[in-house]
Amino acid sequence: MAARLRPLLALLALAALCPQETLAQPLPTTDTWKSEGQVVDSYEASAQLCWADYREHMDLLEKDWCNWTVISRPYSALRDCLEVEAEVFSLGFPNPLAERVIFETHQLHFSNCSLEQPTLCDPPEDVLLAMIIAPICLIPFFVTLVVWRSKGTELKT
């Protein structure tokens, strides 16, 4: 067992002694931080354009914001716009900015929407009783049938 662990321990020691080479990532510099900040700023500007286009579409709707068939197209367009812009700037999606825009959308347009679900109630007692007693009565019948059929096959063999 110790022989199997020896290569793993050597690899772990190498990773601990040379962490930068094992990760194969250059050290971040102030220039890379500045360029990343510019990318995020550019993406934020693009996200604001997506948001403005979405708001324009939603303002055309007459406050029927809880009907999914009405709002699905502008909502999907917003999500697609945020995703495409994230890809343009080589950012992942979803990302914190996109999540913030979508969260703001939900707060602004969908905060008064609630999922309408029918209230479930118990069936009438006679139906409930039939649903309980029917399987209870069928169990002895099926047990008898299985035992009878299994005895018939034992006699033939």
Swiss-Prot record:
Q: Which residues lie on this side of the membrane: Extracellular?
A: 25-125
Q: Taxonomic classification, please?
A: Eukaryota, Metazoa, Chordata, Craniata, Vertebrata
Record has Glycoprotein as a keyword: yes
Name by which UniProt lists this protein: Receptor activity-modifying protein 2
Alphabetical list of Pfam families matching this protein: RAMP
Q: Which family, according to UniProt? A: Belongs to the RAMP family.
- Subunit architecture: Heterodimer of CALCRL and RAMP2; the interaction forms the receptor complex for adrenomedullin/ADM. Heterodimer of CALCR and RAMP2; interaction forms the AMYR2 receptor complex for calcitonin/CALC and amylin/IAPP.
Gene that produces this protein = RAMP2
Q: Which UniProt keywords apply?
A: Cell membrane, Disulfide bond, Glycoprotein, Membrane, Receptor, Signal, Transmembrane, Transmembrane helix, Transport
